């Protein structure tokens, strides 16, 4: 675990802390060395690990699918081509069943969301001490510090900033397509004249406004909560004796694969449903 034997509490807190870069109270910029320093950096602090892993996985997704598209073959398809075709057909079928509007953007968007979120979720299967243990084994430091003293989270979807950022992007698309399809007057009317007519405009606005704002919040919290809980269980298992770790981690990892796929699917499907509702012109 480390040169100093940490307590269970400090071990858990360490593995739940992001690698944070921002401005210190004295005006200098740099990495936070503990949770308090990260909190003092305020709103504009950047979670470097979340940004790096999510961007890297995004490029991995693009590279894999581009590689499969360039080497497509009808005679002897490769394993990668079969996987890509399976993903495309699955997402395309889901969009056709759920989305009732006309748009060439929704299917590619749904595919991107599903694969990207799946890859980010899949990082939860990496052992919690893999990075510091590997760095220490090859004899290198991380950011100039002992590997076991560096904060780094592998799973972007256990960071509420990442899940909220994705859900807010979906929210922007919901508002954009609502206005594009229904017009500004139609969109405003949907918020103010339903479900109880013009005499109840304040109540309608409150009801519909809360419902609209709840969409990105629920999207973000559902994904974050499930993956954060899964990561926390892996960390708790890592505290246990070696033999018990294997007895618990393997079954939990197998079960967690279902959660990884399911949460990516739910995020994608809710996005399709919300955008389908935005395209409905009553």
From Swiss-Prot:
GO terms for biological process: proton motive force-driven plasma membrane ATP synthesis. It is a multi-pass membrane protein. InterPro entries: ATP_syn_F0_a_bact/chloroplast, ATP_synth_F0_asu, ATP_synth_F0_asu_AS, F0_ATP_A_sf. CDD domains: ATP-synt_Fo_a_6. The chain crosses the membrane at residues 45-65, 106-126, 160-179, 232-252, 253-273. Keywords: ATP synthesis, Cell inner membrane, Cell membrane, CF(0), Hydrogen ion transport, Ion transport, Membrane, Transmembrane, Transmembrane helix, Transport. One of its GO terms (cellular component) is plasma membrane. It is found in: Cell inner membrane. GO terms for molecular function: proton-transporting ATP synthase activity, rotational mechanism. Pfam families: ATP-synt_A. Key component of the proton channel; it plays a direct role in the translocation of protons across the membrane. F-type ATPases have 2 components, CF(1) - the catalytic core - and CF(0) - the membrane proton channel. CF(1) has five subunits: alpha(3), beta(3), gamma(1), delta(1), epsilon(1). CF(0) has three main subunits: a(1), b(2) and c(9-12). The alpha and beta chains form an alternating ring which encloses part of the gamma chain. CF(1) is attached to CF(0) by a central stalk formed by the gamma and epsilon chains, while a peripheral stalk is formed by the delta and b chains. Belongs to the ATPase A chain family. This is ATP synthase subunit a. It comes from Marinomonas sp. (strain MWYL1).
